[in-house]
Amino acid sequence: MDNLNINLINDDEHPIPSQDLLLKCLQLVADKHHISHAEVNLNIVSNDEIQQINKQFRNKDKPTNIISFEFEKPQGLPDDIANDFLGDIVIAPAVLENEAKEQNKELNDHWQHIFIHGLLHLLGYDHQDDQEAEVMENLEIQLLAQLGIANPYIEQENQNGR
């Protein structure tokens, strides 16, 4: 894991899982995509901060659990520098805690799911339509199973009739 790095920014010291747990998620995603070097910025923020970011970048004036910003290489930046950096992930722990309680999920399991979800966004996955969502969700389910975490969409599928 020496070639994988998470730059953690948690200025307000919000409670989060161990960095080892998050690195395990990054390792799984990197292995699945044959990535040997990867770097990610992980910003841990309050509900107010993520709401501001969500409004500014997604025109949604409400808190969300995660927002990912895929890295776009500036012109002239050498490939050996740019290729390792995947992008920035912003997570609001209070939103994750509420979701985990509402969905009767273990908090660390939910953290791992949402972090993997964000990492996949950095690699270009999306869920703008049903087909994209199915591909992304299936990959998340597969990766989470490797961590011993049950399919997080089962309850939602039953509620949505999917």
Swiss-Prot record:
Gene Ontology cellular-component annotations: cytoplasm
Primary location recorded for the protein, binned into one broad class: cytoplasm
EC number: 3.1.-.-
Keyword field: Cytoplasm, Endonuclease, Hydrolase, Metal-binding, Nuclease, Ribosome biogenesis, rRNA processing, Zinc
Cell location: Cytoplasm
GO terms for MF: metalloendopeptidase activity; RNA endonuclease activity; zinc ion binding
Co-factor requirement: Zn(2+)
Record Gene3D superfamilies: Metalloproteases ('zincins'), catalytic domain
Keyword Secreted: no
Cofactor binding note from Swiss-Prot or TrEMBL: Binds 1 zinc ion.
UniProt-annotated binding residues for Zn(2+): 117, 121, 127
Domain of life according to the entry: Bacteria
Keyword Nucleus (UniProt): no
Gene Ontology BP terms: rRNA processing
Enzyme class name: hydrolase
Family named by the database record: Belongs to the endoribonuclease YbeY family.
Role: Single strand-specific metallo-endoribonuclease involved in late-stage 70S ribosome quality control and in maturation of the 3' terminus of the 16S rRNA.
Name of the protein described by the UniProt record: Endoribonuclease YbeY
Gene: ybeY
